[in-house]
Amino acid sequence: MVKIRLKRTGRKKLPIYQIVAADARSPRDGKFLEVIGHYQPTAKPHAVTIKKDRVAYWMQTGAQPTDTVRSLIRSTGLLYEMRLKKMGRSEEEIVSEMEKWQARQTERRQKRLVVKSRRRQAKKEAEGKAAGAEA
């Protein structure tokens, strides 16, 4: 059975992962069939590059992505695109749906940033009040 999984590279405390297609019996950093992407979790925001055509090929031949790789693939929109193709949508429909999907994802990221900044500001205000009450 072929798995699509992460192979750790990089150095100590600075991981960089290759997204590879590998036999399920091989060790994590052992033999693999093909490199199909990269993932840098330490970059802000996380950097993910995936060869979409090769991921689609391996998944169509029966390769199973691990949970982490599945979430990375989902974040690039590839799973949604593959689902639309499987449903029999035309190329124009797929392109328009993917543009809508990208817009929704951008909007969600912006909302998350706003919420995060509000939480930071509230935390700073609470710390300021606590410091003022102690003095």
Curated annotation (Swiss-Prot):
Gene Ontology biological process terms from the UniProt entry: translation
Q: Which cysteines are joined by disulfide bonds?
A: none
Q: Where is the composition biased (Basic residues)?
A: 109-122
GO MF annotations for this entry? Answer: structural constituent of ribosome
Give the keywords, sorted. Answer: Ribonucleoprotein, Ribosomal protein
Which cellular components does GO assign to this protein?
A: cytoplasm; small ribosomal subunit
Q: Which InterPro entries match?
A: Ribosomal_bS16, Ribosomal_bS16_CS, Ribosomal_bS16_dom_sf
Where is the stretch described as Disordered? 106-135
**Residue span of the signal peptide, if any?**
none
Entry's family note: Belongs to the bacterial ribosomal protein bS16 family.
What protein name does the entry list? Small ribosomal subunit protein bS16
Q: Which gene encodes it?
A: rpsP
